[in-house]
């Protein structure tokens, strides 16, 4: 699915976030960046058969931005970006030592029930960014969606007061609650011009 790495000299928390993402994106890998350039990373992702490269950028010790890049030697390019309020790691939610998914299965993206059109739009965008599959929620349970799509993992777009949240379910671990990580998104931007900003959505005017 994707190769996951960070900007140069990441903090421990950012590395932990990368490892957590490796455990919820099927058949993906977290790789220590070292001195590798973006071109080096793209070649490594291509050699390993991945369709996406995800780079986690750091600010003041915490993950600030997630950059998604399409892996294709003839048509590689930036797809889009998520700007974050913050994250909660799996261990902070109560889960440790979750194994990665080392087999091919769909990464399904849906929404919580009773959310707005902005959440549905972001669910579709998140599926594009990750190479996943968007499935409308309707009245279906998450377990029903997982069963119909032959997967153990679902990313769910949820309400959050200052933006939107992405949470992750691993049904091979527990069917009762999400395992994380929890990603709190304040802005998303796609290279084709689509974008969303929580301040604009809430009508908050910038300070002059």
Swiss-Prot record:
Coiled coil: none
Gene Ontology terms for molecular function: rRNA binding
Domain (Brix): residue spans on this chain: 1-196
PROSITE patterns the record matches: BRIX
GO biological processes: rRNA processing
InterPro entries cross-referenced by the UniProt entry: Brix (IPR007109), Brix_dom_Rbsml_bgen_prot (IPR023548)
Keyword Glycoprotein: no
Chain's role: Probably involved in the biogenesis of the ribosome.
Name of the protein: Probable Brix domain-containing ribosomal biogenesis protein
Organism of derivation: Thermococcus kodakarensis (strain ATCC BAA-918 / JCM 12380 / KOD1)
């Amino acid at each position: 699915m994707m190769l996951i790495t960070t900007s140069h000299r990441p903090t421990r928390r950012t590395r932990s976030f990368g490892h957590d993402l490796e455990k919820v994106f099927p058949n993906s890998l977290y790789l220590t960046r070292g001195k590798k350039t973006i071109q080096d990373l793209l070649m490594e992702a291509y050699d390993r058969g991945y369709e996406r490269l995800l780079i986690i950028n750091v600010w003041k010790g915490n993950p600030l931005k997630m950059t998604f890049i399409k892996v294709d030697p003839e048509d590689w390019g930036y797809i889009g970006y998520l700007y974050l309020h913050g994250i909660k790691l799996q261990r902070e939610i109560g889960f440790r030592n979750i194994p990665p998914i080392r087999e091919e299965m769909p990464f399904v993206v849906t929404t919580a029930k009773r959310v707005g059109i902005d959440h549905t739009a972001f669910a579709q965008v998140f599926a594009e960014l990750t190479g996943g599959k968007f499935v409308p929620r309707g009245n279906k349970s998450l377990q029903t969606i997982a069963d119909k799509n032959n997967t153990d993992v679902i990313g769910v777009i949820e309400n959050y007061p200052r933006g939107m949240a992405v949470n992750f379910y691993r049904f091979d671990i527990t069917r009762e609650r999400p395992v994380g990580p929890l990603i709190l998104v304040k802005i998303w931007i796609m290279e084709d011009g689509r974008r969303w900003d929580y301040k604009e959505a809430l009508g908050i005017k910038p300070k002059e």
